[in-house]
Amino acid sequence: ITDVNKILAVCEESDRLESAQAFINNAAKELEQGALVFFAGDLNEPSYLDWQADTKDLFDHRGCIVNWGTSKLLVQRGYKDAYRVIHPDPVKCPGFTFPADNKSVIPENLSWAPEADERERIDFVYYYPNKNLQIKSAQIVGPTGSIVRGQRIEEQTKDPIIPPVNNQWPSDHKGVLITFYIKE
């Protein structure tokens, strides 16, 4: 699919935007009290920061520039994408978290679309800026490889990746490790 309106329409049907807005509304009360607020998880949706002009012809984006709704909403409401704060260039550091090359699983069981390059960064940590919070680092945790067109490949990126011990990994996703300094 290369029709951006269709892509976004399917995305809106998922209720992710409603869930993100509910989180934002609830977190506003915490922010008023000076709390540190984080939003993290597998969103099953890429970031709009990774689908702009510089990546439109990479990773099977097929010329599309997509302002994915959930990430756009969070950023518009003041939240920071922690990985992109440290690694702002999605070409050099795409930060792919799916599909991870879990060596104990055959590639076709790790992929939704084995004929495509479906690598995406769909696991995130967002935070709301606070004078008592400083981001220190952002890393990917998991296999150094991914699945592309049904095949295992080793990533050739500048992403800092912490590989699993003994090359064992329990998931088809990689993790995101963000380190913050918190002032008291």
Cite the ranges covered by each PLM segment:
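A structural motif
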Residues: 1-3, 40-45
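Metal-dependent phosphoester-hydrolase catalytic domains
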Residues: 28-38, 45-184
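His/acidic metal-ligating clusters that form di-metal
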Residues: 11-43
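A solvent-exposed, charged loop/short amphipathic helix patch at secondary-structure junctions
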Residues: 1-13, 54-62
